[in-house]
Amino acid sequence: MFSLRSLVDYLRSQHELIDIHVPVDPHLEIAEIHRRVVEREGPALLFHQVKGSPFPVLTNLFGTRRRVDLLFPDLSSDLFEQIIHLLSSPPSFSSLWKHRSLFKRGISALGMRKRHLRPSPFLYQDAPNLSQLPMLTSWPEDGGPFLTLPLVYTQSPENGVPNLGMYRMQRFDKETLGLHFQIQKGGGAHFFEAEQKKQNLPVTVFLSGNPFLILSAIAPLPENVPELLFCSFLQNKKLSFVEKHPQSGHPLLCDSEFILTGEAVAGERRPEGPFGDHFGYYSLTHDFPIFKCNCLYHKKDAIYPATVVGKPFQEDFFLGNKLQELLSPLFPLIMPGVQDLKSYGEAGFHALAAAIVKERYWKEALRSALRILGEGQLSLTKFLWITDQSVDLENFPSLLECVLERMNFDRDLLILSETANDTLDYTGSGFNKGSKGIFLGVGAPIRSLPRRYRGPSLPGISQIGVFCRGCLVLETSLQQLDIPALLKEPHLADWPLVILVEDLSSALSSTKEFIWRTFTRSSPATDLHIPVSQITNHKVSYTPPMILNALMKPPYPKEVEADEATQNLVSSRWHSYFP
């Protein structure tokens, strides 16, 4: 059975955890301390005295690459490469014997183990008081305190298939939480099924520090692949439970610090938010389902796990990258023709992705692109850059140059309007509505990309810079903007891609900043401007340059920023936190 206290002791012994013993406030103060430590690539934090709660708070468990590797010491892409090798090779005794450890691991993942623990490790409240939980308010305009690491367990009312997902939960009162079910997530699908039957959906929320449970809950697994099964496989041992809940039948996992049981209420919605999210902006107030808690279990010495999200890089970036590294060998198996794939955490993962594919016949690359956009959470990708060249996808400037050198604007740009959009992304035409852009660059280069801008100053443009070969960045404002005039500017004709930003120096300060400012503030259908040369058989041909308007535009939400009072408080107390 997993022990969070043992994990805390281990991290402390590795100088990867600091204990903070002075009283701290879960309203804004803890989050600001956490963000500063993450920015400095610092340790996990255990806050022992949290105002208004008897429970300590653990944050920043995954805040560096080193710590993620410590938490998953035996977990690498080699595991999934072995699976691919086994599945792709003709069966033989020698092959099966060589990979016998996989079979042991697979057997360990089957089923769950009931542990007869006396006394029970959990204390029980049948009249729950959620105000005892030290839920964090992370940003000054957040709608209230939130559970930020909830592992939300549901089962399909249709077939009983389970799902474990992570959906933020806002506290409304001592027994009611908002349930931020997003599109393309299993819990939301289960709630839809329940509402079709006019039934409430049983929901169990685990708060656990088990890294494997957390990793499994956010993994983009194929539908109907149980996350608890995946967790057991990753940690190479069965998950254990003390009992099953008498009403829902859900397992009460031993690895939990807290367990909340209850229901998502059919037909009932309540305004949820705002919330400073992992895109780096506030997601706005919208109506979402509610969770009515009927029981609260917690361990006697429970530790409350939490995280803080915001502008990249935060904890979720390192955990998301670990997942991509682990699952990358599976891409060619799940999506034949796709050799490598990366979603960029710098843009909140869903806004931007790139892939290396095979082009063995005419337009096979487009087939692979459409396959990617039809796969689970990848279907929420906005900008997808595709090439058949061997390029390091971690190096986004090189990837961008590779595609821009090869794009034939008569056939290699495809804009899909009126598609589903990530719930947290407000660049589209409405809530959950947006568009997608596919940018193909395959074969031999067809153009030489400029390295420097040699033209004159441009009307309405205050500064001009270069991100990489072929990509020009112009500083302007909504008031000065004249895109039709820019499209006719002859000195831009040699630049395949032109980006419009408010702050050139910030946009070019790093690749991370460029990606975040460019792709979280634009949508392909509404913000990509390029002259149409002809339309033949419903096929649109274009003439470069592409001008991407990445300015902040109404009604985009605000960028998250700590308030001055909290910043001053944390600065003044810094040496008391870390004496």
Swiss-Prot record:
GO terms for cellular component: cytoplasm. InterPro entries: HBDC (IPR022390), UbiD (IPR002830), UbiD-like_C (IPR049381), UbiD-like_N (IPR049383), UbiD_Rift_dom (IPR048304). Coiled coil: none annotated. Pfam families: UbiD (PF01977), UbiD_C (PF20696), UbiD_N (PF20695). GO terms for molecular function: carboxy-lyase activity. Belongs to the UbiD family. PANTHER family: 3-OCTAPRENYL-4-HYDROXYBENZOATE CARBOXY-LYASE-RELATED (PTHR30108), 3-POLYPRENYL-4-HYDROXYBENZOATE DECARBOXYLASE (PTHR30108:SF7). This is Uncharacterized protein CT_085.
